[in-house]
Design a protein with these regions (language model features):
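N-terminal export signals
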Residues: 6-25
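Extracytoplasmic small-molecule ligand-binding "clamshell" domains
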Residues: 28-106
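Short loop->beta-strand "edge-of-pocket" segments that line small-molecule binding or catalytic clefts
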Residues: 37-44, 58, 148-166
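Periplasmic-binding protein-like
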Residues: 43-44, 132-137, 217-255, 277-284
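Extended ligand-binding regions for polar small-molecule ligands
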Residues: 65-71, 143-146, 156-157, 162, ...
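Ligand-binding cleft/hinge of the Venus flytrap
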Residues: 66, 70-75, 79-81, 129, ...
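Acidic, polar ligand-binding/catalytic clefts
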Residues: 78-151
Length: 285
């Protein structure tokens, strides 16, 4: 059975022997145009951003990748990346080095945290083009008072993604009084679907997950909490993209495209197709 150490050793040996494909060198703009293809990395099973449906890869990030490729005059080769233990690992696997099991890095990766501290410790890449401001929201059904103090939800079924910020918040806050009421799901979108189906009384998930879930619910709706959750530490975060550090010509071109899409209303329209309200990233100015 291959160990992680064994896989690392194998990859290192391949590099030393020059056996890794030329594609591992991320393509700057001229090379992308010469090849006629841009390889764009998105996350696997990350609804509403990227997921498979009917054997086809769909989602907000998939549509955005296609739009960027079209505007560059090339074809989009959209590849799914399985999330690793950290976003730093994902940048290594998806952009500047490649995965240990043969995943070829992309020219461009979407859904990357746009954060100064995060960028500083990942100097192998350039983090660019902030295109959305994500945040968490709470939505409830089955008569749940969504504006109440969370302690009043004791005894109600609360849906969250396993090992997520919402999970840690509901289990650990208020002396753990809600811990036994939390139901775990593999993804935030599945937690939303459970609440939409009446299998949970409330869901704490990203606003994009909640809005897209409502969009596909055939007219069913949950009440969205308007007030802040007490002691909830996450104010939201910007989502951007990444290219390899030596591919800044490509990064500059992508930034011009996303800025134009935001100005023209095309970005807003792209999000509306999934029922998601486009919120510009704070860093976009």
């Amino acid at each position: 059975m291959l160990s992680r150490r064994g896989l690392i050793g194998g990859a290192g040996a391949a590099l030393a022997l020059g056996l890794m494909p030329d594609r591992l060198a991320a393509a700057p703009l001229a090379k992308v145009k010469a090849l006629g293809t841009i390889r764009v990395v998105v996350y696997q099973n990350n609804r509403p951003w990227s997921w498979e449906e009917g054997g086809k890869l769909v989602g907000l990030d998939v549509d955005l990748a296609q739009a960027i490729a079209t505007k560059l005059g090339v074809r989009a080769d959209v590849a799914q990346l399985v999330a690793d233990e950290s976003a730093d690992d994902d940048l290594r696997n998806g952009v500047w080095k490649g995965g240990l099991l043969g995943f070829t890095p992309g020219d461009l990766m979407l859904h990357v945290p746009f954060d100064r501290t995060f960028a500083a410790r990942n100097d192998q890449v350039a983090i660019i083009a902030p295109y959305y401001r994500e945040s968490f929201g709470l939505a409830g059904g089955n008569g749940l008072a969504v504006e109440a103090l969370p302690t009043e939800w004791k005894g109600r079924k609360l849906a969250v993604e396993l090992d997520s910020i919402p999970d840690f918040y509901l289990i650990g806050s208020f002396g753990g009084v809600l811990a036994k009421d939390v139901s775990h799901y593999p993804t935030g979108s599945e937690a939303v679907a459970a609440a939409m189906a009446g299998q949970a009384d409330a869901v704490l998930a990203s606003r994009a997950q909640i809005e897209e879930g409502a969009h596909r619910s055939d007219g069913k709706a949950l009440a969205l909490r308007k007030g802040p959750l007490p002691a909830f530490a996450s104010p939201g975060w910007d989502i951007g993209m990444a290219v390899k550090e030596n591919s800044r010509t490509l990064g500059d071109a992508v930034e011009e495209i996303t800025t134009a899409m935001a100005t023209s209303g095309e970005m807003k329209a792209l999000f509306e197709r999934y029922g998601v309200t486009w919120t510009p990233a704070n860093a976009a100015g």
